[in-house]
């Protein structure tokens, strides 16, 4: 079993992200050839939050995924378990509410948010189903979940090339651009170990989310899952 199996130690994963925090965003841009910015924009579009609504961004890291909500004047809370990542985010965007916390035990009351999102972070959670259930708990009735995560390419030949890139090229590139290249070996292994689009959709439904759907990005390199909490979202006065 690889170190990136679903049986993870949260303290070890958090420490790993502490190490990569200073160069995290730059390295991600390099490794994705600039695609991470586009994927994050699509997450914001899928959330579709409007002024007056409150958004929880789980596994927000340095806050790059939270910035568009803050820039739009929304009330966004950026939560992460890596103090190193939060430190970088707070220094860059002091206007965003950064909170240290565990995705499997969210420090919020029931029905606190109009939408909850997690971008490229669910793989790093020790108990992803428990985290999905916690996100459901803190979402208001009628509220929305959006999950962006690396997934499984749908075209066979591309899947083969992608696997080769993950296990060989990605760690080599990270060795030149990251402060902790071994973290990107973990990244490659965790992507390979992650369930495919349909299985993740089933996980989301299993914990109680409704109307689960997903959209493939870049041929399934990334999948954008969306779901709703049963009930009706109250309109703001």
Swiss-Prot record:
Q: What is this protein called?
A: Demethylmenaquinone methyltransferase
Which family is this sequence assigned to?
A: Belongs to the class I-like SAM-binding methyltransferase superfamily. MenG/UbiE family.
Q: Where does S-adenosyl-L-methionine bind?
A: 62, 80, 102-103, 119
Enzyme class, top EC level, equals: transferase
Can you name the source organism? Renibacterium salmoninarum (strain ATCC 33209 / DSM 20767 / JCM 11484 / NBRC 15589 / NCIMB 2235)
Q: Which GO terms describe its molecular function?
A: demethylmenaquinone methyltransferase activity
Q: Pathway membership of this protein?
A: Quinol/quinone metabolism; menaquinone biosynthesis; menaquinol from 1,4-dihydroxy-2-naphthoate: step 2/2
Return the CDD domains for the record: AdoMet_MTases (cd02440)
Mind telling me which NCBIfam families this protein's record contains?
MenG_MenH_UbiE, PRK00216.1-2
Q: Which Pfam families match?
A: Ubie_methyltran
> SUPFAM superfamilies given for it?
S-adenosyl-L-methionine-dependent methyltransferases
E.C. number(s) listed in UniProt: 2.1.1.163
Task: Quote the function comment for this protein.
Answer: Methyltransferase required for the conversion of demethylmenaquinol (DMKH2) to menaquinol (MKH2).
Alphabetized, the UniProt keywords read: Menaquinone biosynthesis, Methyltransferase, S-adenosyl-L-methionine, Transferase
Gene3D superfamilies attached to this UniProt entry:
Vaccinia Virus protein VP39 (3.40.50.150)
InterPro entries xref list:
SAM-dependent_MTases_sf (IPR029063), UbiE/COQ5_MeTrFase (IPR004033), UbiE/COQ5_MeTrFase_CS (IPR023576)
Enumerate the Gene Ontology biological process terms. Answer: menaquinone biosynthetic process; methylation
Q: Which reaction does it catalyse?
A: a 2-demethylmenaquinol + S-adenosyl-L-methionine = a menaquinol + S-adenosyl-L-homocysteine + H(+)
């Amino acid at each position: 079993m690889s170190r990136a199996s679903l049986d993870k130690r949260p303290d070890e994963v958090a420490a790993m992200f502490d190490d990569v925090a200073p160069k995290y965003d730059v390295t991600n841009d390099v490794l994705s050839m600039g695609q991470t910015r586009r994927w994050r924009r699509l997450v914001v579009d899928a959330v579709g939050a409007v002024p007056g609504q409150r958004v929880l961004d789980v596994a927000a890291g340095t806050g790059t995924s939270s910035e568009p909500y803050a820039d739009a004047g929304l009330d966004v809370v950026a939560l992460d378990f890596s103090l190193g990542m939060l430190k970088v985010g707070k220094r860059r965007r002091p206007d965003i509410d950064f909170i240290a916390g565990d995705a499997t035990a969210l420090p919020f009351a029931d029905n606190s948010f109009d939408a909850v999102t997690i971008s490229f972070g669910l793989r790093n959670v020790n108990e992803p189903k428990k985290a999905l259930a916690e996100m459901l708990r803190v979402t208001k009735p009628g509220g929305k979940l959006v999950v962006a995560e690396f997934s499984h390419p749908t075209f066979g030949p591309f899947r083969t090339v992608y696997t080769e890139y993950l296990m060989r090229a990605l760690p080599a590139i990270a060795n030149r651009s990251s402060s902790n290249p071994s973290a990107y070996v973990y990244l490659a292994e965790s992507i390979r170990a992650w369930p495919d689009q349909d299985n993740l959709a089933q996980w989301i439904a299993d914990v109680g989310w409704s109307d689960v759907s997903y959209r493939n990005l870049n041929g399934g390199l990334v999948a954008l899952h969306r779901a709703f909490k049963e009930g009706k979202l109250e309109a703001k006065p």
